[in-house]
Amino acid sequence: MSKKYVYMFSEGNAGMRNLLGGKGANLAEMTNLGLPVPYGFTISTEACTEYNEGGKKLTDEMIDQIEVALAKLEEIAGKKLGDPENPLLVSVRSGARASMPGMMDTVLNLGLNDISVEGLAKKTGNTRFAYDSYRRFIMMFADVVIGVSKSKFERKLDEYKESVGAKYDTDLTAEDLKKVTAIFKQIYLDDQGKEFPQNPKEQLLEAAMAVFRSWDNPRAFVYRRMNDIPYSWGTAVNVQMMVFGNMGNTSGTGVAFTRNAATGEKAMLGEYLVNAQGEDVVAGVQIGRAHV
């Protein structure tokens, strides 16, 4: 019997932390409790270990199981990755069995390309949102998956904002963001000598491998050593339907804690940003930041 590397959220539970990582196990548990969790699947920590010890390659068996899980996710969502009319977009996140906040990598809005971005714009009636998501994806993918410095994109974005008199990202119009997207694609082309990848399944596999590699990045290495986390544990990869915080002023993103991190007081504490995505909170963007 072939080894199982990929688990739909409905196939796991909280007791499978070693295999699915903390995030994957808890997402599975919440799914099985009937909570409204955006659906997805988890690629196991065992796949990570075999990837890193086997020449940094996904086996054919792993790829086959990822494709089967993706097909199930598409069926549940009623959308397809890369579809020109109703595209499915996913996030790709790490999830080790021990909490390692900020140590490993995340890719959001995966599945966008030059065709599906137009489908997203038409489906949502929000062209600005579609191109905001695409330019974010290009920068994240280039940085996390390929290793193109994020600062190259941030510098060009700042230059563009200055040229049009925009103080904040949220001041940019749909047409502005189309131009920023083209600028970002050119940065990728200049750096890599090839166009930004347009095949969504290729994007997904590359992002999953990048998360596996991030288990061994310098930040994660130091954190593991400081916290006695064995290398052999590996990290899982969680692929989940996107929920968007950047669709306008009625959406947002945030973090919440059950205790005050500074004092230890048992009280809810958090902060959020309106019309933003999760990485903006982590990156320390201050505009629109509110505390709860």
Which ranges hold each PLM region?
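Nucleotide/phosphate-binding sheet-loop regions of phosphoryl- and nucleotidyl-transfer enzymes
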Residues: M1-R289
